[in-house]
Amino acid sequence: MSGGLFIDGVWRAGAGAQATSVDPTTGEVIWRQATASTAEVAAAVEAARKAFPAWADRSREERIAVLRRYKDVLVARTGTFAEALSRETGKALWETKAELGSMAGKVEASIKAYDERTGEHANDMAFGRAVLRHRAHGVMAVLGPFNFPGHLPNGHIVPALLAGDTVVFKPSEETPLAGQLLVEALEEAGVPAGVINLVQGGREVGQALIDQEIDGLLFTGSAAAGAFFRRHFADRPDVILALELGGNNPLVVWDAGDPEAVAALIVQSAFITTGQRCSCARRLIVSDDAAGRAVIDAVAALSERLVIGPWNGGQEPFMGPLISDRAAAMALAGAKAMPGQTLRAMTSVDGLSRAFVSPGLVDVTGETVPDEELFAPLLQVRRVGSFEEAIAAANATRYGLSAGLVSNETAHWDRFLTRIRAGVVNWNRPTTGAAGTMPFGGLGNSGNHRPSAYYAADYCAYPVASFEAENVTNTLGDIKGLRA
């Protein structure tokens, strides 16, 4: 490999500015390459356009065979790939190994979803048959995030390739190495030249990509970026947009019993991945009584026990660093500006890099808090007087990605399920729960009604209805109002 770009089956050095990727745990530079120029972005899209007809014409079985080889490559490379992800993101090795498992598992889940949701179905008709088929859109641009730099773009790329689309992939500028390793695995699996292309860079490269004649944009990231893309493509109804955005996710605890058991679910909802999951709980809503206070105390106590440290340190951590020193500085500033009573302060962590922060807990009861996603381990607590107030507080957001209820009362769950506005709703499970066999997406500022995961098949192909008779028959008698 002689460069950080992969265009038309060839690795090449970029003509843009130099870029680096830094291990947030140590500050060490672990990747250094030149980014893509506008001309190279255009070349990547042209390569994908040129490769599209032949790839789309391949049989389903041929495309499946390539993707199953890709799965095998991922399995074989799990150890080295997971370590690279841990170095680039700071995430614990148990997390990055799980991420590799999800990437490999995506292949079979996508095959099943494609056949179930976008396969071919026929019905007999008096004249012959009516057939539903699905066709690939063409060239898909995939913009990846930093928090799951393998799994989340993989969740777009695999179903797109399976459907017959070709792809130009731009990873997050925070995690270029992860994107490179993903494309290397596809290359080893035998994906034909031009079917997958990789361009590296920041916002200017992303802008150059969406300015091209693409057929779809598959994006995972912030609500602000999603709003920008909607405006950008307002006059391009031909471009399929699949936007998986953030959340200001509520977790309601009501009549839940053991505070320690409840606290374990809350911590796994709010502080896993150092709060850098779009489905992390940001708002904890509890009863304003002794039971609610016991839950709050249990969360604060359990938070003190969480191991915060490097992925390759002496003790396995629950939390690693945030993605960068800059992200940590923004998180600390956001925590400081949060109104209310600080129950556990978010702070820097002594003896570790500036990217490490501790989990924070703030009681915001009675306060007006901006409806924003703070991508960090900071949990707001709000105490309310009734379960109906709890549901109202949970729904008091423009977002609608994930929500959860912790309760031993089935009646509460039934009520919560019918009233909550979210695309992922969990009962006595962390808000971060998801599965490749289910859709994943949200309402409001959290998406555009094109959920990913199992429903990714829907936005990777479009339906074609055909009405077919094998022979020409004389239908003259069917014409009404015909002169003799």
Curated annotation (Swiss-Prot):
Binding sites annotated in the UniProt record for NAD(+): 221-226
- Which ranges form a coiled coil? none
Query: What are the UniProt keywords, alphabetically?
Result: Arginine metabolism, NAD, Oxidoreductase
Going by the entry's taxonomy, the superkingdom of the source organism is recorded as Bacteria
Q: GO: which molecular function terms?
A: succinylglutamate-semialdehyde dehydrogenase activity
Assigned EC number? 1.2.1.71
Q: Tell me the active site.
A: 244, 278
Biological process GO annotation list?
A: arginine catabolic process to glutamate; arginine catabolic process to succinate
Recorded catalytic activity of this chain's protein = N-succinyl-L-glutamate 5-semialdehyde + NAD(+) + H2O = N-succinyl-L-glutamate + NADH + 2 H(+)
Instruction: Kindly indicate whether the keyword Oxidoreductase belongs to this entry.
Output: yes
Answer yes or no on keyword Oxidoreductase: yes
Which InterPro entries would you find in this protein's record? Ald_DH/histidinol_DH, Ald_DH_C, Ald_DH_CS_CYS, Ald_DH_CS_GLU, Ald_DH_N, Aldehyde_DH_dom, SuccinylGlu_semiald_DH_AstD
* Pathway named in the protein's UniProt entry: Amino-acid degradation; L-arginine degradation via AST pathway; L-glutamate and succinate from L-arginine: step 4/5
Function according to Swiss-Prot or TrEMBL? Catalyzes the NAD-dependent reduction of succinylglutamate semialdehyde into succinylglutamate.
Q: Which HAMAP family does UniProt cross-reference here?
A: Aldedh_AstD (MF_01174)
The similarity comment for this entry is:
Belongs to the aldehyde dehydrogenase family. AstD subfamily.
Put simply, this protein is called N-succinylglutamate 5-semialdehyde dehydrogenase
